[in-house]
Amino acid sequence: QHKDAIYKQDKGIKNYDNSVGYNKYNFRANIDANLTKSTIIELGLSTEIVTNSFPGYANDTKALWQTQANLTPVTVPVLYSDGSLPAYGASADQQNPYILLNYTGYKKKNETTSSIRLRLEQDFDQWIKGLKAEATMSINNYSALTQSQTKTPALYYAQGRNKDGSLNLIEKVAKTDDKYESTNL
């Protein structure tokens, strides 16, 4: 199962993959064998691999949808004419959806769940009528790896234009360097 998000992202801005999406792969195998007339063995294997990808600002896309819902198309430009990133809001520190998608980095979470089930059945009917024995063993494993490269871009508030026509920008949010994290579970 592969699902890409419907967001339009600029692929040329950065040198890493910040795509938003969900991938899920399932594998299942059941093997039953009669080892002898009185011995049956069953083996069940299953694995599920899930990869979730998000923008760097959060572990989901909720903030992106909230930001999008609170903005009209004319509230704030995607970018200022000089390429600076705009801030908006009462304290001029909020980011538009374009910035959240393209300038905050990425987070990827890979999860793997595996199960092995082994069942052995022995029929002792040849020695004692109706006697059977059964043994079952099961092993489950879960692992997760989360990797992220997050950052905050510099955001500016435009107070108008200077006499030469350039924007009069005030930095409202300072840029932070990339922060790399990796967590295993």
Give the ranges of each region predicted by the language model:
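Flexible loop and strand-edge segments within Gram-negative outer membrane beta-barrel domains
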Residues: Q1-A5, N18-Q95, G105-E111, A144-T146
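Extracytoplasmic loops and strand-loop junctions of Gram-negative outer membrane beta-barrel proteins
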Residues: Q9-N15, Q95-G105, K172-E181
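Flexible, surface-exposed loop regions and adjacent strand-edge segments
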Residues: G12-N18, A58-Q68, Q149-Q159, G165-L167
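Residues on the lipid-exposed face of transmembrane beta-strands in outer-membrane beta-barrel proteins
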Residues: A29-A33, I116-Q122
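Membrane-embedded beta-strand positions of outer-membrane beta-barrel proteins
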Residues: L43, L118, A133-A135
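Outer-membrane beta-barrel transmembrane domain signature of Gram-negative proteins
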Residues: P73-A87, K151-L185
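Phosphate-/polyanion-interacting regions in eukaryotic proteins
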Residues: E134-S143, G165
